[in-house]
A protein has these predicted regions:
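Nucleotide/pyrophosphate-binding catalytic subdomain
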Residues: 1-183
Length: 183
């Protein structure tokens, strides 16, 4: 079997309960499957949403905040929780993970994009599974307009992935938010 470079994107609703708390069973299953891919000789990168949802869950908030600064604070709290759990889950399968937080500016600027690519390549060389997320605690445009589907596609192109897998609870592919544009 030939070695492939695979980018897997997981959405917030896929890895959290409705309460916003992280779904440990699903996170463990994700870590196991991605570790199996890694064991088979593939290079695996994970683009993970969930920081804001995890922050809200950890803080006991019943609803996601509407104000940007509160979303950013929940992202900061949740990102720590998310990476702690990912590190714990992947270590059960003898895998090392690394965090890479990216903003739109990092991808728009040629030098910053090159630095991100170099970091990803070195992490893969060291047999580490990079976990990528938008840096929602400092981002402005992304937290309002962006999503990790776009980030995963850009990452897949940047790293020259052979395959991009989007794990979501949305049925199908859309060119706009299906909750806002139902057609």
């Amino acid at each position: 079997m030939e070695k492939r470079r695979v980018v897997v994107k997981v959405g917030s609703s896929t890895i959290t309960h409705e309460s916003g708390l992280l779904n440990l069973k699903k996170l463990d299953e994700l870590a196991r499957v991605l570790s199996d891919l890694d064991n088979a000789g593939h290079e695996v990168l994970l683009v993970s949403s969930g920081a804001i949802a995890a922050g809200c869950g950890k803080m006991g908030l019943e609803q996601k905040p509407k104000e940007l600064d509160e979303k950013q604070a929940m992202a900061a709290i949740g990102q720590c929780e998310l990476m702690y759990i990912y590190d714990k889950m992947f270590s059960q399968y003898s895998r090392k993970v690394a965090q890479l937080l990216i903003t739109k500016r990092d991808l728009d600027d040629e030098q910053l994009r090159s630095n991100a690519l170099n970091t990803l390549q070195v992490l893969l060389k060291y047999k580490t599974i990079p976990i990528i997320n938008e840096n929602d605690s400092v981002a402005i445009d992304e937290i309002v307009y962006g999503d990790n589907d776009t980030l995963s596609a850009i990452t897949a192109r940047l790293i020259r992935a052979d395959l991009l897998v989007l794990l979501s609870d949305i049925d199908g592919l859309y060119d706009a938010d299906p909750s806002k544009c139902p057609h």
